[in-house]
Swiss-Prot record:
Residue spans of biased composition, Polar residues class: 251-260
Modification(s) after translation: Phosphorylation of Ser-1026 by PKA increases the binding of CA2 and changes the Na(+):HCO3(-) stoichiometry of the transporter from 3:1 to 2:1. Phosphorylated in presence of STK39 and dephosphorylated in presence of PP1 phosphatase; phosphorylation seems to inhibit SLC4A4 activity. N-glycosylated. May not be necessary for the transporter basic functions.
Biological source species: Sus scrofa (Pig)
UniProt family annotation: Belongs to the anion exchanger (TC 2.A.31) family.
Phosphotyrosine found at: 30
Stretches the record annotates as CA2-binding: 1002-1004, 1030-1033
Annotated tissue distribution: Expressed in vas deferens epithelia (at protein level).
Name used for this protein in its record: Electrogenic sodium bicarbonate cotransporter 1
GO molecular function: monoatomic anion transmembrane transporter activity; sodium:bicarbonate symporter activity; solute:inorganic anion antiporter activity
């Protein structure tokens, strides 16, 4: 009774008998991706059940229902519409819900081989398709593989596959060392169970051991050798006179025409480049289907080996086989066998059925897996979709975790729809972050940070042993050097060279190297910021107006600020970071990105002003454009027509000699020399410099465009995967080198990078150490605490917001953060920089994001058609440390760095600003303002929040950003950090303007004091809640509640093409599925 299929409960509903044409058309119903199965249809008509129908219902009720009797026939017939979990789902929940310590099942490579005639003579197993994630077919020409595509299956083939599993041999956890041993085991099992006649054993064995021909690239000589082997084996093959099939003897088993039964892989397998697409622990699933003329009923077997075994040349790639599905059937149904083979191969590539196949205990577990797959598919009407069209793989695959969690006793998720919302959507609330939990003890957070990071300290060095780290070092180094030069120049102008470019280089090197070596998050890059520059300018002017010693006053402000930062560290004040929601993070990071973009264009416009373009120049009138140098007072100068001084002799001529004694030709002077000796430039072309501005803009935009294009080269169709990845990793360095070479070849004198060549203070009025006393009155030391409070807010906000952005959940950092440890080292370094009169440094948002982007890791092996999965970031201390060491050594590399044009580095700045805006939800919402409704992307928040509320949220964020920009551009920029803090208050005020439902999708819900208590209560309710019904209310108040239709496939009987070896004892009419699936 266990193997006997139940009767079809809906058989009597259909009175129409299908003809052969309709059955053939049934194959054109194709199945694609999953859709919601939660639709309830009401029955409008009631019909009195007949005698036969009542009898069938009573039988089903006895076998599958917990009720003792069935009183209402109509209620019984419509029970599939009740939102009760099906027996198949119950069984899968039991299978996947088992908690064990075994590792996750390995990746499967599935190969479909079909029994085909070679050159119209002998039969061989020929590979026709393969799967890892998506299907690849051998094109009809037989010379190439198709592009990976989503497998579209006929509904009919899935029903037939289910029947195969019901009627065929299921052999689980068997042991075999070779293919002949495995085949013999399968055939003997079929004979023992009465599914195969003993006299057919030799023929079936001979067929299953035929040679396997794989679709691999071979040389012409190898192809000729294969042809010779085929002819040789054909000469040894003979045909049985009874049925025309090859006869089988024990002598034939050792014939060279059979499959290579060696347990070692062949050379072609070892050379197959397709192995790069498979992980190292991958296993194989082989599907063998074909038609023979000596069988009257199908030969079906599904085998799972206890341990994966190498079965010679059975598989295209040298991976051990774990699963084997065999289907041999009578002649005339090759199309059906092919579709059934595709169906089981597609199921084996499905993540849920893949797990079920590894954990199944018996036949019913496998059938339940097929039923679960059927529950999750959609059917496309045959008249509205051409099944010949191959569906391209999606860029992002839907996670199978939803389906797995449903059956593994996890959270209550709604299948084929939206998952219950948990709030953050990747940016995350930080309330549940372990690093931000307040300990209540003195330096408790700092101690926990040290304990958390100490075990990873050694790995932080050897994890950098990858070529990707080299590209990150070069990229971030150039960005850091450019920023140090720019900031140092501005700081020198603001402080009368008390701090200049060299101090900027030295401070960057010392602070950055120490921070990356010992801080909690070494991926953070320290740099100077705009608010610090504004503060330095105001402080210098204040000291100058009140006759204070600027460097000593600044020293005491730095000491007080460092002291206040250490107090914040000791009191675990970093827990306040949890109030920095997506609204604050994206507002801050977007502002800094816009500043980078604005500054890049601002520098180029300034360069265009310095080297103006002569827009009135006409080629035909170039003789009218000139510029000559003339002496300031021709009367006092003796100009000789006979004797002149060459330009190289000018250094020996004093200014007095030029005015009184020298005979001199002023026309030979350069523009710089002419102005130096007080000459005059005369002509209509003196204010213009040819080609420099245009060439600079070409370098600027070319570097940016090239960097963007090469960074995306990883997803290009050109070159092998390794070459594309290498080009993508070194995209910025390659762009810089390309346009440096172009600049050198063209020869236009574009402005170049200028690095100090001497190691000494910029100003001769200062040294490398600032004495703490003697320059100012004693009360200044105490009064310095007031401006130090403002600096502390500035440092805390810049540092912690950048740290929050770096430690976002979507970066998948595994070694943890260290908010307290980071702030501790920033305070210590502030003391060092104050004593050495070096600039103060804090985390730089854009450069830190660029550092993370340059170290992102993706899966090395990905299935054809599958996008590489983001694994995380290469967390280590080497790249940052070497970047800052190289920055300090840049003084000695000035002869090399002077060949880099400044417009190229400005292009890198533009790239960093634009790249850091990628993936920011704020930018996505800005784009929505310009999109018609029908073209808007399917963002999760657009499903649940009205569009006008989304636009209102975006408008408020833009308004705050505009106010911050205006504030930054004025003298009031010194209170910029305080206004960043005000963003938290603005976000808190949004609670009165938006509902918590809307904010949970647009932003993160601000943590409340009792949030942990609520979460604990929610978990208790989940444990007490029943797992037996899909219609229970979700714990999430925002999930949609819709009824689910569960069709228990266990109660359907299907006999599409199989003949039962044990005829039924009673006569009955054909069932619904029999009439639809019989061939």
């Amino acid at each position: 009774m266990e193997d006997e299929a139940a009767l079809d409960r809906g058989a009597s509903f259909l009175k129409h008998v299908c003809d052969e044409e309709e059955v053939e058309g049934h194959h054109t119903i194709y199945i694609g991706v999953h859709v919601p199965k939660s639709y309830r249809r009401r029955r409008r008509h009631k019909r009195k059940a007949g005698h036969r129908e009542k009898k069938e219902k009573e039988r089903v009720s006895e076998n599958y229902s917990d009720k003792s009797d069935v009183e209402n026939a109509d209620e019984s017939s419509s029970s599939i519409l009740k939102p009760l979990i099906s027996p198949a789902a119950e069984r899968i929940r039991f299978i996947l819900g088992e908690e064990d310590d075994s590792p996750a099942p390995p990746q499967l490579f599935t190969e479909l081989d079909e029994l085909l005639a070679v050159d119209g003579q002998e039969m061989e197993w020929k590979e026709t398709a393969r799967w890892i994630k998506f299907e690849e077919k051998v094109e009809q020409g037989g010379e190439r593989w198709s592009k990976p595509h989503v497998a579209t299956l006929s509904l009919h083939s899935l029903f037939e596959l289910r029947t195969c599993m019901e009627k065929g041999s299921i052999m689980l956890d068997r042991e075999a060392a070779s293919l002949p041993q495995l085949v013999e085991m399968i055939v003997d099992h079929q004979i023992e169970t009465g599914l195969l006649k003993p006299d057919l054993k030799d023929k079936v064995t001979y067929t299953l051991l035929r040679k396997h021909r794989h679709q691999t690239k071979k040389s012409n000589l190898r192809s000729l050798a294969d042809i010779g082997k085929t002819v040789s084996s054909a000469s040894r093959m003979f045909t049985s006179p009874e049925n025309g099939s090859p006869a089988m003897t024990h002598r034939n088993l050792t014939s060279s025409s059979l499959n290579d039964i060696s347990d070692k892989p062949e050379k072609d397998q070892l050379k197959n480049k397709f192995m790069k697409k498979l992980p190292r622990d991958a296993e194989a699933s082989n599907v063998l289907v074909g038609e023979v003329d000596f069988l009257d009923s199908p030969f079906i077997a599904f085998v799972r080996l206890q341990q994966a075994v190498m079965l010679g040349a059975l598989t295209e790639v040298p991976v051990p086989t774990r699963f084997l599905f065999i289907l041999l059937g009578p002649k005339g149904k090759a199309k059906s066998y092919h579709e059934i083979g595709r169906a089981i191969a597609t199921l084996m590539s499905d993540e849920v059925f893949h797990d079920i196949a590894y954990k199944a205990k018996d036949r019913q577990d496998l059938i339940a897996g097929i039923d679960e797959f059927l529950d999750e598919v959609i059917v496309l009407p045959p008249g509205e979709w051409d099944p010949a069209i191959r569906i391209e793989p999606p860029k992002s695959l839907p996670s199978s975790d939803k389906r797995k969690n449903m059956y593994s006793g996890g959270e209550n998720v709604q299948m084929n729809g939206d998952t219950p919302h948990d709030g953050g959507h990747g940016g995350g609330g930080h309330a549940d972050c372990e690093e931000l939990q307040r300990t209540g003890r003195f330096c408790g957070g700092l101690i926990k940070d040290i304990k958390r990071k100490a075990p990873f300290f050694a790995s932080d060095f050897y994890d950098a042993l990858n070529i990707q780290a080299l590209s990150a070092i070069l990229f971030i180094y150039l960005a850091t050097v450019t920023n140090a030069i720019t900031f140092g120049g501005l700081l020198g102008d603001a402080t009368d060279n008390m701090q200049g470019v060299l101090e900027s280089f030295l401070g960057t090197a010392v602070s950055g190297a120490v921070f990356c070596l010992f801080a909690g998050q070494p991926l953070t890059i320290l740099s100077s910021t705009g608010p610090v520059l504004v503060f330095e300018r105001l402080l210098f002017n204040f000291s100058k107006d009140h006759n204070f010693d600027y460097l000593e006053f600044r020293l005491w402000i730095g000491l007080w600020s460092a002291f206040l930062c250490l107090i914040l560290v000791a009191t675990d004040a970093s827990f306040l970071v949890q109030y920095f929601t997506r609204f604050t993070e994206e507002g801050f990071s977007s502002l800094i990105s816009f500043i980078f973009i604005y500054d890049a264009f601002k520098k180029m416009i300034k360069l265009a002003d310095y080297y103006p373009i002569n827009s009135n120049f006409k080629v035909g009138y170039n003789t009218q454009f000139s510029c000559v140098c003339v002496p300031p007072n021709p009367v006092n100068i003796s100009v000789s027509n006979d004797t002149t001084l060459a330009p190289e002799d000018l250094q020996t001529v004093s200014s007095a000699d030029m005015y009184h004694n020298a005979t001199f030709d002023w026309a030979l002077l350069t523009k710089k020399e002419c102005l130096k000796y007080e000459g005059k430039l005369v002509g209509n072309n003196c204010d213009f410099v040819p080609d420099i501005t245009l060439m600079s803009f070409i370098l600027f935009l070319g570097t940016y465009t090239s960097s963007m294009a090469l960074k995306k080269f990883k997803t290009s169709r050109y070159f092998p995967t390794t070459a594309r990845k290498l080009i993508s990793d070194f995209a910025i360095i390659l762009s810089i080198l390309i346009f440096c070479v172009i600049d050198a070849l063209v020869g236009v004198d574009t402005p170049k990078l200028i690095v100090p060549s001497e190691f000494k203070p910029t100003s001769p009025n200062r040294g490398w150490f600032v004495p703490p006393f003697g320059g100012n009155p004693w009360w200044v030391y105490l009064a310095a605490a007031i401006p130090a409070l403002l600096v502390t807010i500035l440092i805390f906000m810049d540092q912690q917001i950048t740290a929050v952005i770096v430690n976002r959940k979507e970066h998948k950092l595994k070694k943890g953060a260290g908010y307290h440890l980071d702030l501790f080292w920033v305070a210590i370094l502030m003391v060092v920089c104050s004593f050495m009169a070096l600039p103060w440094y804090v985390a730089a948002t854009v450069i830190s994001i660029a550092h993370i982007d340059s170290l992102k890791m993706e899966t090395e092996t990905s299935a054809p058609g599958e996008q590489p999965k983001f694994l995380g970031v290469r967390e280590q201390r080497v790249t940052g440390t070497l970047v800052f060491i190289l920055t300090g050594l840049s003084v000695f590399m000035a002869p090399i760095l002077k060949f880099i044009p400044m417009p190229v580095l400005y292009g890198v700045f533009l790239y960093m600003g634009v790249a850091s805006l990628n993936g920011v939800q704020f930018m996505d919402r800005l784009k929505l303002l310009l999109m018609p409704l029908k073209h808007q992307p399917d963002f999760i928040y657009l499903r649940h929040v009205p569009l006008r509320r989304v636009h209102l949220f975006t408008f408020l964020q833009v308004l705050c950003l505009a106010l911050l920009w205006i504030l930054k551009s004025t003298v009031a920029a010194i209170i910029f950090p305080v206004m960043i803090l005000a963003l938290v208050a603005v976000r808190k005020g949004m609670d009165y303007l938006f509902s918590q439902h809307d904010l949970s999708f647009l932003d993160d819900v601000i943590p409340e004091k009792d949030k942990k208590k609520k979460e604990d209560e929610k978990k208790k309710k989940k444990k007490k809640g029943s797992l037996d019904s899909d219609s229970d209310d979700s714990d999430c108040p925002y999930s949609e509640k819709v009824p689910s239709i569960k069709i228990p496939m266990d109660i359907m009987e299907q006999q599409p093409f199989l003949s039962d070896s044990k005829p039924s004892d009673r006569e009955r009419s054909p069932t619904f599925l029999e009439r639809h699936t019989s061939c």
